[in-house]
């Protein structure tokens, strides 16, 4: 899809042209050229229309940029509700499905404060910490995204139907799974990578040593995102997972300021840009000027800069360093860059 803007063009493309695409094996080309089973595709489109759902593909400009930058972003997302540009300022909150009073209180406080600071809260609509985070965010007037481990038409757990509806009206519910997919256990690790991928960082509130929320934290690390954890009672099983993360280097969180400090470079970045005059721009090297112009609209991940500049990665890194040393560009957590 990086070469063909329209999926239909992929199927009508010449065999030899498809072979020129990096990573496309002859067997894959053969499958593409021989594909004629369009009936299931038509059925899926009809389901989308009937359920009034949106399908967002990887090449769509509206595809979430945080998620786009992970190693294996889902090629498409089923969505009910709306994802906005401001949702790139997001923190995921995950944890135990059976939290204690302390876990509930902390989650409510942090989620509400994030919402009041214009941060979107991402979670998985599960029982416990997930649901508490979604509700606290909504109550504070914020936006929240829920990622499902099932088809988007399958609300799980069933008692969250009203919460599902409220989220879709004040954020979005999304899934990479086909309509009708049941919430199988094997789906949830895939869901977790999306939760962390949508976010600048992941906060683990309470988790046992084998909690699925630790998988989300692992994905966050792999995706070069921040990992935060709420410290807990050393004698409680619910604290062992989060305390272990802190021991390994996760940011200890006492209040929302600990999170905002780490992602501060992403907040209000548009108002902090350094605008160069014509003389200063002309004084830049050609590659520096190109990178400056690419970064003129918003912060971008290093992979995006390399792709958009069409320059070798070593050249991009060298020129970014030069711009950074001259105070023109700043680096943010997760290998993002923006105009200072």
Describe the residue ranges of each PLM region.
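Short, small/acidic-rich helices and loops at N termini and domain boundaries
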Residues: 1-61, 229, 302, 328-340
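Glycine-biased, small-residue-rich flexible motifs in mid-sequence functional cores and linkers
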Residues: 49-50, 57-340
């Amino acid at each position: 899809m990086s070469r063909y803007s329209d999926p239909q063009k992929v199927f009508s493309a010449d065999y030899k042209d498809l072979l020129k695409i990096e990573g496309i094996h002859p067997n894959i080309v053969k499958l593409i050229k021989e594909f004629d089973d369009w009936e299931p595709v038509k059925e899926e489109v009809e389901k989308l229309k009937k359920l009034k759902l949106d399908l967002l593909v990887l090449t769509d400009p509206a595809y979430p940029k945080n998620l786009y930058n992970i190693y294996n972003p889902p090629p498409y997302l089923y969505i009910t509700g709306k994802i906005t540009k401001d949702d790139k300022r997001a923190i995921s909150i995950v944890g135990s499905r059976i939290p204690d009073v302390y876990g509930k209180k902390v989650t409510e406080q942090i989620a509400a404060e994030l919402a009041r600071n214009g941060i979107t809260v991402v979670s998985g609509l599960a029982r416990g910490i997930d649901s508490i985070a979604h509700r606290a965010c909504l109550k504070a007037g914020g936006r929240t995204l829920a990622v499902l481990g099932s088809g988007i038409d399958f609300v799980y757990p069933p008692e969250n139907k009203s919460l599902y509806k409220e989220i879709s009206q004040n954020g979005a519910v999304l899934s990479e799974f086909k309509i009708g997919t049941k919430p199988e256990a094997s789906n949830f690790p895939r869901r977790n990578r999306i939760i962390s991928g949508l976010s600048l960082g992941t906060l683990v509130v309470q988790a046992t040593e084998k909690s699925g929320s630790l998988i989300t934290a692992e994905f966050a690390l792999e995706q070069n995102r921040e990992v935060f954890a709420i410290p807990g009672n050393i004698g409680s099983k619910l604290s062992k997972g989060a305390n272990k993360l802190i021991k390994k280097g996760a940011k200890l969180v006492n209040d929302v300021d600990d999170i905002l400090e780490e992602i501060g470079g992403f907040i209000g970045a548009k108002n902090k840009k350094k605008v160069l005059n014509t003389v200063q721009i002309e004084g830049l090297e050609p590659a520096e000027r190109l990178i400056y112009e690419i970064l003129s609209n918003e912060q971008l991940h290093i992979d995006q800069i390399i792709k958009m500049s069409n320059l070798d990665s070593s050249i991009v890194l060298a020129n970014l360093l030069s711009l950074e040393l001259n105070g023109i560009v700043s680096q943010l957590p997760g290998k993002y860059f923006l105009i200072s």
